[in-house]
């Protein structure tokens, strides 16, 4: 485990009702849901920002649950979570598109099995609006899909969201409602006596929580081991995606892949093409077993294989349109299902583990159940009341690129910084960057700003705007420019001034 460089006593002696370990989509959504009660909630995340691992390194698809077996926790929570997405994203002011999913079939011999499969998904598994559509209908909706597709299984409930944007929004709303998010805070060990966690040692002091929620992703098994309650193992699985330039977005408006109904491996998800919430196309991911929990290196073979496979979905796909690529590490158990339950040996522990795809989709529903479980556990020691002042609404930074000329002019007259263009590719203004740095959960790094308002997400990948973003961070925070980091750790952009320090 890569640990933060910070060593201090900022959290020494803290006694929260609930300590949430992990700042991914699971931990952040649970923290927000917990604030519906009058509870002291502390979320500890070892990285310099939330959504730094799997929650910031996935394709952003909101799954309808077509491919999940009945009776699993995954299937139960994906159905419930999918239905909650419209309301959640509206409350948190996060872009969300319910664009539909197409699974194309190449052989007429699979038509009857496809009909039976769609009916089984719809009527037995509760995956609403699952049906078979003709090739003619498919090409009318998505004209660039492979003309060899004879028909497709379609579901209208699939959607696309920005995964790190939603995680940040969850965390910000939790903070707005009174939660504390401690970044650069790693759990090192636990003091467990008589089947109860008495204290949790971090690099920032010892914490004394009433209960602990383990939402630590690939490290959930390590936290469980510290708590003396490990009954599952995580076997990390890498997945690589490529992001295409927005000009390629015209190739498809929804989510698509091609499949065969022949039985394949038990790996979750087989990759596809996603029209993202920000109008790029995303190609992938693949699924490769690994023993390294934090190896986010991207292999050329993964990109090649993803494109080779998905050119069966859209023949016009071209690697020349790639603007960047990334790899995430999933956290499956060997049972390939979620672990959402109270500790079996440790009384004041809740596990939220084994969260792999479709964990982004399931997060709202999982958070609701875990928060109720936690509130009930805390109520054993003292009364827990509803938080009457809870506010579910979070207003994001105004998105200049989505405004009409009239709306832009009105905003610029009120806030001149919104008239200073910093990122040309994504049309991001100085005002948006300043507001991101003044948000409920500000992160004063170039990547922190990038994840919040998208400078550097376009074709040039920050080649033009990165120095300007760094200057704005320096200006807003008052720190020297050479102290500004790209991300966490020692990722400094500069090493000092030139010409004897006068900067000229």
Q: What is each stretch, according to the model?
A:
Residues 36-56:
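Glycine-rich FAD pyrophosphate-binding loop
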Residues 1-18, 36:
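Extreme N-terminal leader/targeting segments of oxidoreductases
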Residues 16-43:
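N-terminal Rossmann-like FAD-binding beta1-loop-alpha1 element of flavoenzymes
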Residues 60-141, 270-271:
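Dinucleotide-binding Rossmann-like beta1-alpha1 core, especially the glycine-rich loop
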Residues 29, 190-196, 202-284, 288-297, ...:
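Flavin-dependent oxidoreductases
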Residues 154-211:
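Helical element adjacent to the flavin cofactor pocket in flavoenzyme catalytic cores
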Residues 268, 294-421, 428-441, 457:
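C-terminal catalytic lobe of FAD-dependent flavoproteins
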Residues 74-79, 107-113, 153-172, 295-301, ...:
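Short beta-strand to alpha-helix junction loop
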